[in-house]
Amino acid sequence: MGLLAVAESQPGSPVVEVRFDGDDDCLPIEIEGALLRIAQEALTNARRHATAHRVVLTVTFQPSTVSLDVVDDGVGFDADAVGVRGFGLTSMRGRAKQLGGTLNIDSEPGQGSAINATIPLRPGPGTAP
C-alpha cells in the first residue's frame, strides 16, 4: 500500500508513523485509492490546522473490512461544529461512503484528533462469497 509514500511526501512537521495490522494481499484498487486520499487529507489537516508534532496512521485488515486510523497530537477541534463546513472532512466522508464505508471523527479542543475510516471488502472475481 502506498501509505509510506504518502507519509514521506509530507515535508516537515509532523513526524508520521505508519503501521499495518493484518495482511493486504487482495486490497481492491478503488479501496486502496480511497484510503490513500483520506490519509493525504488527514495529514494535510494535521499539518495545516492542528499544529501536530506526531501523527500515527494505522491500517487494519480484517476478513470483511479494512480500517484506516489517523491519530494526531495536535490542538484538536470541535468535530460537531467543523463537520458541516469542513471541505476536507466532507471529502473524506464522501470517499468512504461511496464504497459503503463510514468515517468517524473524534476530537475535542486541546485533545488532538482521531479519524477512523472503515470500508467493507467485496469478494473479488473467483472468490467464494
Q: What is each of the regions a protein language model found here?
A:
Residues 1-129:
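Coiled-coil dimerization/phosphotransfer module
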